Amino acid sequence: MTRAQHRALEVLWPKYGIGDDTSLLTAIGIFGDQRPLTLEIGFGNGQNLVDLALAHPNQGYIGVDVYRPGAGRLMLALDRLEIGNVRILLQDAAEVFLRRFTERSLDNVLIYFPDPWPKKRHHKRRILRPVFLHNLALCLKLRGFLRIATDCNHYCQTILECIALEPLLTNLDPPDQGMEPLHRRTITKYEAQGIERGHPILDILAQRA
């Protein structure tokens, strides 16, 4: 972590951070109005959130991650660009659904390039598993979207199988259906690495039934 990132976590956290208590989070509680609310899980360096927030200032965005240097970098960018519609939650994503968000409170959930844990003995560490997807689906509004991207074909197939087993989610195929510019993503470091290695970029779009 750089000195600037460390200082951002200290100085800018009251402005952009969300406390790790057990209070439920809503758009009106965070932003003071009923704006649409999008949650990005694993925001990395935060560039995707910055780009979305700048393009759509009337939307509300929350980034969830445990990587503190990335949070510090994101807060520096938010402060420099005077962005007011992004908040950061430093918490394990597996703990936020139903603990921090109520049912039918989120318009969109974005999960871009989650760790595929390619070794079979590590598959249990993957975040996108049935219980996680069920709790996530409960927190989506009716007809809300779950948007996932990965460059791991095996992980993609596993995710699709989990979605097929979840009655609250409908897989939209082809995956670009409904992918309006509001949620077209910024190419992340991990996506760029996948492209450089010749991996296909696989998009999944599911909707709350």
Enumerate the language-model features and the residues they cover.
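S-adenosyl-L-methionine
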Residues: 1-39, 47-54, 75-103
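Conserved beta-strand/loop positions that form the S-adenosyl-L-methionine
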Residues: 39-41, 64
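Conserved glycine-rich SAM-binding loop
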Residues: 44
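Conserved SAM/SAH-binding beta-strand->alpha-helix loop
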Residues: 67
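A short glycine-rich, Lys/Arg-flanked "PGG" loop and its adjoining helix->strand segment in the class I
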Residues: 128-142
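Conserved beta-strand signature within the Rossmann-like core of class I S-adenosyl-L-methionine
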Residues: 142-150
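Class I S-adenosyl-L-methionine
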Residues: 158-161, 165-209
